[in-house]
Amino acid sequence: MSLGLLGNKIGMTQIFDESGNIIPVTILKVGPCVITQVKTTLNDGYNAIQVGYGNVSTKALTQPQLGHLQKSNIQPLKYLKEFHVSDPTEFNVGQILNVESFVAGQLINVTGKSIGKGFSGLQKRYNFARGPMTHGSKNHRAPGSIGMGTSPGRVLPGKKMAGQLGNKTANIKKLKIVQVNNDENILVVKGAVPGKPGNLLSIIPSK
């Protein structure tokens, strides 16, 4: 069962282990999440639970979104996401999920949006080598040739060129949980996770 939760990135810091080694860690505020819908193979074609996170005013939601939550008598929630489960009968609508489903030493996958860095050139975006800086060269950071001539007479799809860098979904796999704080719903994981502090994250156990 890969039960996932939603949360926010708080920021990075460092802690010391028993041997005195410094471990770079990220602090995550995870849940509490509310189960807003349970899907089964019989009714929906697959087994999953829909999880809601982040209390919000009713004015911030559309009528269909409000109706979906009010049908289950659940308070307005900002984010909804589905997670596949093997046995949906273990869950009930309105059930609260928190970090108690995770333990220290467990490996998790964290998904979120990476930091957007705007329109970037090839050196920054793809680590391309630059051109000569001297001897009369006028090609310092230019892309160079982007294709052949008459045949095929076009730029091939997928050609690496300058453009938007970041602000895309990034998935970091097998991050190790260092500490779990059940009272504050805090996870401390080794390493970095996508995005800036406050970024919405999806956390699921690694397979």
From Swiss-Prot:
Keyword Transferase: no
GO cellular component: chloroplast; cytosolic large ribosomal subunit
GO biological process: translation
Molecular-function GO term, any one: rRNA binding
UniProt keyword annotations, A-Z: Chloroplast, Plastid, Ribonucleoprotein, Ribosomal protein, RNA-binding, rRNA-binding
Cell location: Plastid, Chloroplast
PANTHER family: 50S RIBOSOMAL PROTEIN L3, LARGE RIBOSOMAL SUBUNIT PROTEIN UL3C
HAMAP family reported in the protein's UniProt record: Ribosomal_uL3_B
Assembly and oligomerization: Part of the 50S ribosomal subunit.
Function: One of the primary rRNA binding proteins, it binds directly near the 3'-end of the 23S rRNA, where it nucleates assembly of the 50S subunit.
Record-stated family: Belongs to the universal ribosomal protein uL3 family.
Protein name: Large ribosomal subunit protein uL3c
Species of the source: Thalassiosira pseudonana
Organism taxonomic ancestry: Eukaryota, Sar, Stramenopiles, Ochrophyta, Bacillariophyta
